[in-house]
Amino acid sequence: MASKVLPQALLVIPSNHSLQCPPLKKQLGFPIDSNRRFSLSSNCRSNLMVSRASSNLFSSNFSSIFSFPARNSFVVRSEAEDSSDAPAESVAVVAEEELPVESEAEAEERPPRQQRVKLGDIMGILNKKAVHAAEELRPVPGIRTGDIVQIRLEVPENKRRLSVYKGIVISRQNAGIHTTIRIRRIIAGVGVEIVFPLYSPNIKEIKVVSHRKVRKARLYYLRDKLPRLSTFK
């Protein structure tokens, strides 16, 4: 390490051949004769020559150590860049050509996404199917509030005999297959209300006797009115 640092320190000394060592009279404090001065000057020149030679050797060693890998790295980089130019372009072109084909194939292979069916939708579908099946067995006329209807009902407890009920429809509650109607009539001066499921299999026939126009959807106010308003022919 010291051998490498010493030439760097010696490089600071100027390289002029005519330069002589500075007088040592002031430094040493006593006079020096010419022979000794000449010997000192020769010694200084020899030191200068040694320092110059050592600096040249050091510079040559330094350049040989540090410049050779730099040249090799530069050559390697240039070769890598030259060799990778053409394949990079070809790879890019191939990738651009293959991307649309893959996207089209994926679009064709993917099946259409099915929408999620909620529980309420399922119940609605089942109600529609049940209503459609019940209407095929027995057609149901359009019944509105205020109509006078006649219903033929089969009673299982009465040896399946048919009973006829007639009255005014005071309300209708729509609930799919569970739709019901409420009928009111006067029996022995007393108002009687009966609820019938509209799609019940025990109902064999529903007949609309007459239609009446009313303003309200539910005629519950007839309960407080006179019985003659709830009678019909």
Swiss-Prot record:
Source organism (scientific name): Spinacia oleracea
SUPFAM superfamilies for the chain: Translation proteins SH3-like domain (SSF50104)
GO molecular function list: rRNA binding; structural constituent of ribosome
Entries under InterPro entries matching the protein: Ribosomal_bL19, Ribosomal_bL19_sf, Translation_prot_SH3-like_sf
Family per record: Belongs to the bacterial ribosomal protein bL19 family.
Quaternary structure (record): Component of the chloroplast large ribosomal subunit (LSU). Mature 70S chloroplast ribosomes of higher plants consist of a small (30S) and a large (50S) subunit. The 30S small subunit contains 1 molecule of ribosomal RNA (16S rRNA) and 24 different proteins. The 50S large subunit contains 3 rRNA molecules (23S, 5S and 4.5S rRNA) and 33 different proteins.
NCBIfam families associated with the record: rplS_bact
BP term (GO), one: translation
An annotated GO cellular component: chloroplast
Compartments reported by the entry: Plastid, Chloroplast
Superkingdom field: Eukaryota
Keywords annotated in UniProt: Chloroplast, Plastid, Ribonucleoprotein, Ribosomal protein, RNA-binding, rRNA-binding, Transit peptide
General function of this protein: Component of the chloroplast ribosome (chloro-ribosome), a dedicated translation machinery responsible for the synthesis of chloroplast genome-encoded proteins, including proteins of the transcription and translation machinery and components of the photosynthetic apparatus.
Protein name: Large ribosomal subunit protein bL19c
